[in-house]
């Protein structure tokens, strides 16, 4: 009798545990569906650990986006992953460069420009390699991302000193943090970086051989899905996002980048002295890219 009682109790316990597990599974599935619906309805922006994304970081962290509207930042460390998210409709907006933007637009005509950004790129050489001129890139490794502004600038650097392209070894390193780390560890001869990674490299006494600012090239951009932005809810989200972005630009221009060093350190993974070295950087409010910059990207892509 005692054994029978113990057996019944054991069965009841197992049955109870089974119910709890099934109930838990059901609730977890329901929660996942709920969260997926909320994420789908939100305005999602793909961002990178780069300084051109600072207005988005500031607007989110300092509640400059109207809280009545759901705006979410999606974080990536490689531009290719940003573009994949955009092409697969996992985000509605993406911070990118004009070369990658034009490549996306060619594949999907529903993608268009929201704004240019203040991003600029520098070709930086490892101080140990002792390269003082672009012609010294011969037989050296250059880190970049294919079909991006860094790829285009690599061509520009090589062509400007009439080097044979096959004598400069292009190494595709998509993650900007890994690219910088390879320079710091002396695993790369040269690379193309934007801020704040470029500033950290400069503080380590690595040499700048090319700067898009001196070439009058403004290649940073934010793209969006044009058709979706005409829908009532999306348009409202976009209007709120634009206001928050512009307000963030005003704040940065008034207070300076260093005033938001905590945000740059948090999202870009650089040191405080790196942020403090970034002086006189201004952020423009929403304005479309210049046509001749777009044409520059198109012309380069047409040869690929």
What is each residue range found by the language model?
Residues 98-100, 167-264:
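Pocket-lining segment of extracytoplasmic ligand-binding domains
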Residues 19-26, 147-169, 240-279:
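Ligand-binding clefts/hinges and TM-proximal coupling segments of bilobed small-molecule sensing domains
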Residues 43-44, 139-144, 227-234, 246-253, ...:
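Second-shell loop/turn segments in exported
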Residues 84, 128-135, 158-160, 166-168, ...:
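Proline/Glycine/Serine-rich low-complexity intrinsically disordered segments
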Residues 21-164, 170-171, 182, 189-195, ...:
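Short, glycine-/small- and polar/acidic-enriched structural segments
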Residues 2-8:
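Sec-dependent signal peptide recognition
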Residues 21-30, 35-41, 51, 190, ...:
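An extracytoplasmic/periplasmic, membrane-proximal ligand-sensing/linker region
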Residues 15-16:
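C-terminal motif of bacterial Sec signal peptides marking the signal peptidase cleavage site
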């Amino acid at each position: 009798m005692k054994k029978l009682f113990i057996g019944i109790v054991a069965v009841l316990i197992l049955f109870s545990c089974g119910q709890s597990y099934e109930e838990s599974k059901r609730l977890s599935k329901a929660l996942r569906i709920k969260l997926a619906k909320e994420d789908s309805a939100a305005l999602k922006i793909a961002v990178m650990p780069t300084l051109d994304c600072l207005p988005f970081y500031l607007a989110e962290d300092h509640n400059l986006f109207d809280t009545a509207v759901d705006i979410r930042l999606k974080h990536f460390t490689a531009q290719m992953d940003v573009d994949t998210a955009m092409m697969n409709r996992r985000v509605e907006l993406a911070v990118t460069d004009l070369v990658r933007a034009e490549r996306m637009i060619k594949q999907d005509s529903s993608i268009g420009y929201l704004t240019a950004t203040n991003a600029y790129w520098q070709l930086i050489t490892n101080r140990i390699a002792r390269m003082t001129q672009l012609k010294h890139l011969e037989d050296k490794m250059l880190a970049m991302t294919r079909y991006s502004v860094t790829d285009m600038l690599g061509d520009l650097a090589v062509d400007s000193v009439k080097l044979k392209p096959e004598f400069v070894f292009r190494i595709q390193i998509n993650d900007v943090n890994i690219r910088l780390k390879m320079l710091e560890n002396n695993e790369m001869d040269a690379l193309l970086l934007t801020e704040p990674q470029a500033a950290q490299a400069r503080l380590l006494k690595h040499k700048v051989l090319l700067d898009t600012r001196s070439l009058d090239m403004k290649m940073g951009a934010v793209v969006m899905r044009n058709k979706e932005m005409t829908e009532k809810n999306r348009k409202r989200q976009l209007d709120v996002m634009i206001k928050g972005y512009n307000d963030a630009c005003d704040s940065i221009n008034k207070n300076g980048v260093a005033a938001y060093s905590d945000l740059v350190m948090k999202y870009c993974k650089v040191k405080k002295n790196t942020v403090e070295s970034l002086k006189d950087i201004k952020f423009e409010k929403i304005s479309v890219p210049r046509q001749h910059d777009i044409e520059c990207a198109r012309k380069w892509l047409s040869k690929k």
